[in-house]
Each structure stands twice: as C-alpha cells, then as structure tokens.
Curated annotation (Swiss-Prot):
Subunit and interaction comment: Homodimer. Part of the ribosomal stalk of the 50S ribosomal subunit. Forms a multimeric L10(L12)X complex, where L10 forms an elongated spine to which 2 to 4 L12 dimers bind in a sequential fashion. Binds GTP-bound translation factors.
Disulfide bond recorded as keyword: no
Any single GO BP term: translation
GO MF, one annotated term: mRNA binding
Source taxonomy: Bacteria, Bacillati, Mycoplasmatota, Mycoplasmoidales, Metamycoplasmataceae
HAMAP family noted in UniProt: Ribosomal_bL12 (MF_00368)
Pfam families, A to Z: Ribosomal_L12, Ribosomal_L12_N
UniProt cross-references to PANTHER family, sorted A to Z: 39S RIBOSOMAL PROTEIN L12 (PTHR45987), LARGE RIBOSOMAL SUBUNIT PROTEIN BL12M (PTHR45987:SF4)
Listed name of the protein: Large ribosomal subunit protein bL12
Highest taxon in the source lineage: Bacteria
Keywords: Ribonucleoprotein, Ribosomal protein
Reported function: Forms part of the ribosomal stalk which helps the ribosome interact with GTP-bound translation factors. Is thus essential for accurate translation.
Record InterPro entries: Ribosomal_bL12 (IPR000206), Ribosomal_bL12_C (IPR013823), Ribosomal_bL12_C/ClpS-like (IPR014719), Ribosomal_bL12_oligo (IPR008932), Ribosomal_bL12_oligo_N_sf (IPR036235)
Family: Belongs to the bacterial ribosomal protein bL12 family.
This protein's encoding gene: rplL
Length: 124
C-alpha cells in the first residue's frame, strides 16, 4: 500500500462535506483514544493584553421558520446521534441549543445552511 502524503490527505479533506469530516474526526478520536477534554491549549506568555479569538462556539436555533420539515432533516444531518423524534422536539422547542464546541468556520457554514431553509441561528 502506498504511503499517504500530507498533501494528498489535505486534498481528500477538501473534497469532503462537513458530515464526512465530522465522521472522520469521530473515527480518529475513537481509533487513537483522544479525549477532547484532556487537551490543554497553551496560553500566551504575555500578560494576556490581547483579546483571544474564540476557537469554539455554540450554535443555537432561535426560530425554525415556516417549514419545519427541512429544518428537522438538517438537525439530524448535523447531529446524527439524535432520533427523528428528538430532532423534532428540539426544533419545536426553539430557541434551543443545537451544538456545542463547534469551530467558528464550521458554525458559519451550518448557519448559512439553516438560513437557506428559513431558520434563524445564533452563534455564541
């Protein structure tokens, strides 16, 4: 088997959608026994005068809009661990937290996808 190069791996990642990348990350966590809560982020050596950019955000569904069915499907897509009934309850109980500890870039993509469905999302 040929060795996978860094460049070919990155190119493969670029061709994946968000769901596939999330599945890959979860598989890597399981394969290598990575516990995200055990990761320590190094702080700056200075006195902390600079404002740090958020590295993880929370996505909240504020309003599902007029057509809830596609919103429920999108909730299931980004949170495959939820059953159809749980996703429906989450959408019906808006405002409700959709996802925690999401990278800001991924959160913006998710927000855009929900906005296209007529739902209102906030990123905190």
């Amino acid at each position: 088997m040929a060795k996978l190069t860094k460049e070919s791996f990155i190119q493969s990642l670029k061709e994946m959608n968000i769901k596939e990348v999330m599945e890959l990350v979860n598989a890597m966590k399981e394969e290598f026994g990575i516990d995200p809560s055990a990761v320590v982020v190094a702080g700056g050596a200075a006195g902390g005068a600079e404002v740090a950019e958020k590295t993880e955000v929370t996505i909240t569904l504020k309003n599902a809009g007029g057509n809830k069915v596609p919103v429920i499907k999108k909730v299931r897509e980004i949170s495959p661990e939820l059953s159809l009934m749980d996703a429906k309850k989450l959408v019906d109980s808006a405002p409700a937290k959709l996802k925690d500890n999401v990278k800001p870039e991924e959160a913006e993509e998710i927000k855009a996808a929900f906005a296209a469905l007529g739902a209102e999302i906030s990123i905190d």
